[in-house]
Structures are given as structure tokens and as C-alpha cells.
Amino acid sequence: MAFWGVEVKPGKTFTLKNNEATGIRRLHLSQATLGHGTATNRSILQCNVGNKSPLLLCVLTPDKVDSCQLNLEFEETDEVIFSVIGPRSVHLTGYFLGRSTGFRPNDDESESFGEDIVDTDMEKGSSDDYDYSDSFINDDDPAVRGSHVSSTDDDEISIKEMTAKTKEKKKNGKGRRLRKKFQVSDSDSDETSARADESSNEDSVEVLNNGNEPKIAKVHSSESPLPSRVTRSKARKSTLESGEPAKCEKTFEAKINTHKTLDNREDKPLDDAKLSPVQKDCEILSKKKRNKERSKSSAIIIDSDDGEGKNMPESLQNENPVSDKGIKSSSDVLLSQNGDATLSKKKKKRDRREETTDVPECPEKKKQAIDKNIEKEAGTKKPLETRTLSNGVIIEDIEKGKLDGKSAVKGKKVSILYTGKLKDTGNLFDSNLGEDPLRFRLGGENVIEGLSIGVEGMRVGDKRRLIIPPALGYSKRGLKEKVPKSAWLVYEVEAVKIR
């Protein structure tokens, strides 16, 4: 690799030419960086390859994107022209690569003994077109050839011994090792045989040819047994080399049968008769717990419905005796299991008390309670300041909020909590306590005029009592049947939010 860099200035182009002496050179373009300058406009880098239309590579903007990482390689027979569109130059950096080399599919795979393959002229092709005549050593050659050693038994030849033998072969120049990646062929012809991929999870067979005495190693399988077609092809291969098919078939079939028996044993579930006594006790206890939970839930439902049974329809009332019988039977079972009737009765009573105490109150009752508490507090609190306006509205300041908060002025949106009562009778006719605050624009027509006048000038957290005359209340229309037209109104108001 050789470093490469250039500055492409605006209005000028840079042409990348191939070197005629060394042939085509591969340029790896790594980064584009904005040059020095005071211009704030963006600069665009583009390139032309031969007569093709220009392509934009990156856009650089000062103070935002000053550099851009690129990962581009140029190996073109035509000229590559770089140019800049914009006020500032662009610096390009990268490096030259060597000549392009072909892809080697077996580069990532390592030889079984850490040695490279030499003197092997292999061509890509299908398993049917390839001639395997040169793939095996003749029987006359006393050299020992081995594939991957997958056996870990003590009787197997160790890796160290195999490496020593291969070194001796190289010194003498007699042995030559060859490795190929075979695939299992679908045809059952005698000319081609199945080849298994070389990996740690696949079955491997080691054949040692010493004269005419074949030795077949054990088959080691980590995940699954060999398919029948592979066994046939391998057995056929061994017959061609050694002439003893019986031994090969017996060894392969014995291994496959052992795998099948082991798989069948693992797949069979355990019967109930073979369970240990501890497991049986656990199952009985879990069933008892389920029965208890069911009986408790059904008892609670019936006890809560006892008070409302009178108002229920006849169809639902007729269903109660059936459920009672079912509960009695389940409770009898529980009594027979526990042996103590008094404890179960106490538990039922306790559950009934908890059910009665945990019944949630109605929202209307809660609201009434809140209103009563507010009325008591408002009645006990004395006004800090009282003033009467010229239009008859009486304003009593009960509590001061934030002194530095926003003041309610006409045109602003105000959110308030309020309670409205009649001055003469004290009856509550309107309230939003416990609900969302009332939101309106001050000076608008969404609320009565007296309420809008009384809220003006309040800050967040302020509380006021407003006494509004009928003329500024509901004198024109009234409020349904709750407020007569001639009624004086008393509002307790709290400012929650001012915008």
C-alpha cells in the first residue's frame, strides 16, 4: 500500500490516470476534508468516470460537516476526474493497493496439520464433470494419507505422530497430500461417491492403506447419525479400495444403531409409575392449593352478593343454590384434608370483613365529603381583606398565593377551581372540585360577568370569596331550576393556572 493525497480546488479538476508500467492501479479513497477558507457555503465533491454522467460523492458544509469518511475503490481503465462545486477546496486522502487478486474460497480454512497445499491444479466444476482419478494415491505407494483426525480414543494415532510422518514424506519427496471439499452426490452410481464437508460437527472416516490391509477407524458423530445414502457410498468406497465390504458395513451400521437407540431413549417421556415419591407429593400439594384458591374466590363472590340478592332477577337468584352446593362440597374436601373446621370458618369471616372494608366509595360521596370539608374551612377562615366594587361585587381575599406570579388580566386564559352557592339558603348549585379546572379567557362570554370581574387581578394560588349581585349573575336566564333569577351568588374561587 502507498499513501495518496491531493487537493481539489474549485474551478479546477484532478484526473486520476492508470500507470502504464504497472498496469491498472487500485486507489482506495478514504476521506474527504474541507480546505481552509472564509466562505460559509457548502462544497460538493463529484467524480466522472470516462464518458459517464458525474456522480456526487459527498457534501461538506463549514462548521457543520468539515470531513466525510469514504470507502471507495477505483480500478478503472478509463480516467477518473474529480472536481469541486463550491467556494472552498477539498482535500482527498487514501492509498494505492496492489494488483487485484482472484478470490480464494479456501483461504479461511486451515489445513489439518497447518501446512499449505502445493502442486494441486484444481478447476471449478460439478461433481459429475470432475475426474477423481488423481485424488487418491495408488495402493503401491506405501505413504500414509489421512483426513481430519476426529477420534479421541487412545488407540487412534495421535496428531504428533501424523505430523512427524508428513515431515518425513516431505523430506523424501515421496508423499503428496491433497485436500478437497466434497459434496454428497445424489446419484447412486459406482463411479462417484459421497463426500462430506470437513468440519468438527461432521463424521470423518480415516482410511489407512498399508499394502492390502485396510483399517477402518471409528465413526464419531456429535449431533446426528449418518444418512443411509452416505453409508452406502462410503461402504462402496471401502470395497473398491480394500475389497472387504462386510467389515465396513458392520462398523457403520453398528454406530448408526447405537445413535438411534440413544435418541429413542431420550425422546420417551417418563411414566407416572416411574416418578419419585417426592415428585408425587409436590403434585398433590399443588392440586390442594388450586382447590383452596377456587373455594376462596367462589365464597367471596357469594358473600358479596348476599346483600344484593333481593334486587337481583329470579334467573340469577336461582343460580345461587347450585353454586352453594358446589362450595359446600369443596369445603368438605378441604375439611377432610386439613382436619380442622374452626380454622376454615375463621378464615372465611376474616375474608368477609376484608371484602366489606375494601369496598371503594362512590365518587359522588367523595365529592360531597370534599365539598363539606371546603365549606368548613372557608367558613372558619376569616378574610384577609374585603372590598366592594362600584358594580356591587364584594371581593374577600381568603389566601394569598405567589406574589411574583402572573396576574389575571383581560385577554389571558385562566384556570380556576370553584364552588357556587346561593347566598340566602347556602345551597350548593355548582362545583368542579375533584375534577379538571375550569379554563376560560378573562373578559369573554364563557362565564357570568360577576365571576369574570371577581377573578381579575388574582395570581396563582390566590383564593377569593366573591359575592355577586343578581344583575351580574343569572338574572337574565337563570340556571335551570337551581338558581332563580333574583338570587345573590357566593363563589369560592382558587386560581390554579394563568397563561
Curated annotation (Swiss-Prot):
Presence of keyword Transferase: no
Top-rank EC class of the record's enzyme: isomerase
UniProt feature, compositional bias: Basic and acidic residues: 157-166, 244-253, 260-286, 352-365
Compositionally biased intervals (Acidic residues): 108-120, 128-141
Keywords, alphabetical: Isomerase, Rotamase
Composition skew (Basic residues), residue ranges: 167-182
Region (Disordered): 101-365
Name the record gives this protein: Peptidyl-prolyl cis-trans isomerase FKBP43
Organism: Arabidopsis thaliana
Substrates-to-products reaction catalysed: [protein]-peptidylproline (omega=180) = [protein]-peptidylproline (omega=0)
InterPro entries: NPL (IPR041232), PPIase_dom_sf (IPR046357), PPIase_FKBP_dom (IPR001179)
Known EC number: 5.2.1.8
Function, in words: PPIases accelerate the folding of proteins. It catalyzes the cis-trans isomerization of proline imidic peptide bonds in oligopeptides.
Keyword Coiled coil: no
Domain PPIase FKBP-type per the UniProt entry, residue ranges: 411-499
SUPFAM superfamilies in alphabetical order: FKBP-like
Regions of compositional bias (Polar residues) in chain numbering: 328-341
Family: Belongs to the FKBP-type PPIase family.
Stored Pfam families: FKBP_C, NPL
GO molecular function list: peptidyl-prolyl cis-trans isomerase activity
